[in-house]
């Protein structure tokens, strides 16, 4: 099935809504609750306004399942992320006299090289978790802008960069490894979300895993909203149809129908078998 968002993560939502319709004819001990956030893709902007209202308004759920494309593998962990913007300052002047002025792009270029050097350091001697495809925290500069004309020395440049950190590392400590105190640069936080590190010894996960009929559990490289729920003490897991690596965020995003069938089957089994799963705790 081809369509924007089919993998990330409307396929999961379709299965959940279908299961909700079936729940109308059942009398579960606890309700089947659905929480829909907004602006997740541009920085998890909606969930901070929602998460503190979940328990007061809906009660304490036994399990929170966050739908993301894991190919229906149970995911118990992902890294946290902080997005930053560095504003670099220089002096405007005619390029014929360029050596007489501070070039904001040079300040930005030096900073970008620092992020690259720090990335090498983290890969070599930083904390590790081999359950991840990239088993260490990462620093990535993704956008650089500056200058208005070739014959003008730039007085301002911007660098957008991020830190994706293991849950055992504080992003502030990683940021402090960079030279952020220069009078020629100002760094601000754009957005952030927490990582997820679920208690893998919880017997509930083994029973939940049995409902999927696929190998696991796993940890994923991309971020989700799961860490927000876990942070307020809720038992949280990530699972959903489709593959982020091969299907998500692609020009012709799509999802295999078989993945939707597996997700739909999982939702049905979960609704009928949830109480027996939870009795193991």
Language-model regions, residue ranges each:
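Acidic/histidine-rich catalytic neighborhood of metal-dependent amide-processing enzymes
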Residues: 9, 13-83
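Short, basic/glycine-rich phosphate-binding loops at helix/coil junctions
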Residues: 1, 31, 186-188
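Glycine/serine-rich anion-binding loops at beta->alpha junctions
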Residues: 1-15, 94
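Conserved Rossmann-like nucleotide-binding pocket used by diverse enzymes
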Residues: 2, 65, 140
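Acidic active-site catalytic centers that drive phospho-/nucleotidyl reactions
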Residues: 8, 40-41, 68, 162, ...
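Metal-dependent amide/peptide-bond hydrolase catalytic core
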Residues: 76, 83-281
């Amino acid at each position: 099935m081809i369509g924007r968002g089919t993998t990330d993560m409307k396929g999961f939502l379709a299965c959940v809504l279908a299961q909700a319709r079936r729940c109308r004819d059942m009398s579960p001990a606890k309700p089947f609750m659905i929480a829909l956030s907004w602006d997740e893709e541009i920085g998890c902007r909606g969930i901070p306004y929602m998460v503190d209202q979940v328990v007061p308004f809906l009660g304490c759920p036994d399990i929170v399942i966050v739908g993301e494309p894991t190919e229906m593998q149970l995911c118990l962990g992902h890294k946290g992320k902080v997005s930053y913007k560095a504003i670099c300052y220089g002096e405007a002047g005619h390029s014929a006299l360029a050596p007489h002025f501070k070039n904001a792009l040079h300040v930005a270029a030096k900073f970008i090289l620092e992020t690259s050097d720090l990335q090498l350091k983290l890969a070599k001697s930083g904390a590790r978790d081999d359950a991840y495809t990239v088993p260490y925290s990462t620093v990535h500069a993704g956008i650089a802008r500056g200058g208005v004309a070739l014959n003008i020395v730039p007085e301002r440049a911007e660098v957008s960069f991020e830190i994706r950190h293991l849950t055992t590392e504080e992003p502030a400590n990683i940021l402090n490894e960079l030279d952020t105190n220069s009078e020629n640069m100002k760094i601000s936080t754009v957005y952030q979300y927490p990582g997820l590190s679920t208690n893998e010894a919880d017997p509930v996960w083994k029973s939940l895993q049995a409902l999927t009929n696929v190998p696991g559990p796993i940890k994923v490289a991309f971020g989700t909203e799961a860490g927000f729920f876990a942070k307020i003490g809720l038992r949280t897991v990530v699972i959903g149809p489709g593959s982020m690596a091969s299907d998500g965020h692609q020009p012709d995003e799509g999802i295999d129908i078989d993945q939707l069938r597996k997700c739909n089957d999982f939702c049905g089994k979960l609704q009928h078998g949830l109480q027996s799963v939870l009795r193991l705790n």
